[in-house]
Each structure stands twice: as C-alpha cells, then as structure tokens.
Design a protein with these regions (language model features):
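An N-terminal amphipathic alpha-helical segment
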Residues: 84-96
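Intrinsic disorder/low-complexity segments
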Residues: 106-109, 169
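Basic, glycine-rich
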Residues: 158-175
Length: 175
C-alpha cells in the first residue's frame, strides 16, 4: 500500500491488523496463513518484500519454529509502525533441528548444519557484526523487543583471516 510507512497505514487498518495478529498468534495458524499467501501472492511486487530471497519451505520452517506468539512479537512492531521498525531486525533466524541447527539469513540462505547451539533455546536470532561494526539504535530496539517476547538474541562478532571474496582479500592483498 502507498501509505505503508506512514501513520495512516496502521490508523486506518487498526482493527484488521490487530485481528490478524491475534489469528497469527493462535498455534498453527501462522504456517497456514503463510502458505496461503505465498501461493496467492508470490511474485507480486510489494514494498519490503523480496520473494526471491526465501523459498516457501524456508519461510514455513521459520514460522513453525517461532510459533504464533513469538511470530507476533516480530510482525506486530512492523505492522504497527513500519517506518520505525523496518530497520535493525537481526541478520539471522536460527533453530534447533535434528543433528544441529537450521536457519535463514537476510540474503535468503537456508541451511541445516551441526555444531553451534544456544543452551536452552529452540529458536534464536543473531545479529552479526564485524570487529569495527557496532550495534545501532534500531538494532538495540529490536533486540530489546525480541528479548521481552522471550526470544534468545545474540550479537555475534565475526573475525576472519584470509577473507576472500569476488574482489580478492578483504585487506586489499592478493588472494
């Protein structure tokens, strides 16, 4: 909608938005709603939606792992005030799966691997930072909101040696 990101968006749709959030909060409803909307709208141009980043299966897995109440903790702020909450959501959503963990990243990656686990958490968010990067105000707001909802959130500092990409080494040296 053209008014997404304005005060009018939520004000004119308050009852419908709150009803949908209550519906999503019911156990199992999130996956059903996601699959229905994915089939109906996948590929339709919409502000803030990058269909090519995530498959229906990756989205459904994330929705199931989060569960209704925690999903509402993520969607509620976006629906009520998109302008303020569109930035800062942590980079990764991770969850326990057989043999380790699975997850989705902001670039659309979907994986399952063994190794890293967060004690006592079945699903968690990770904000990834380089050594010189700092957690900004929008990220701090999201971290606090997600933690209040009972979600585990970690800030992960990554340090790499011999980081090689398409342009060569990150330090400017020869790859």
């Amino acid at each position: 909608p053209l008014d997404l990101g304005t005060d009018a968006f939520y004000a004119t749709r308050r009852d419908a938005i709150e009803a949908r959030l209550r519906q999503i909060g019911e156990e199992g409803a999130g996956e059903r709603i996601l699959r229905e909307h994915d089939r109906r709208f996948r590929g339709v141009l919409a502000r803030g939606v990058a269909w090519e980043r995530f498959s229906e299966e990756a989205l459904a897995e994330g929705v199931v792992r989060l569960g209704g109440k925690r999903l509402v903790a993520v969607l509620g702020p976006l629906a009520r005030d998109y302008r303020s909450w569109r930035r800062g959501l942590p980079d990764l959503l991770l969850w326990r799966s057989e043999g380790g963990f699975g997850g989705v990243g902001c670039g659309g990656e979907y994986w399952a691997a063994g190794g890293y686990e967060v004690p006592g958490a079945d699903v968690w968010f990770a904000e990834v930072k380089s050594p010189r990067d700092r957690v900004g105000p929008h990220q701090k707001a999201w971290i606090a909101t997600l933690r209040r909802a009972g979600l585990w959130v970690e800030v992960c500092r990554v340090v790499g040696e011999d980081c090689v990409g398409a342009e060569g080494r990150a330090d400017g040296g020869e790859g």
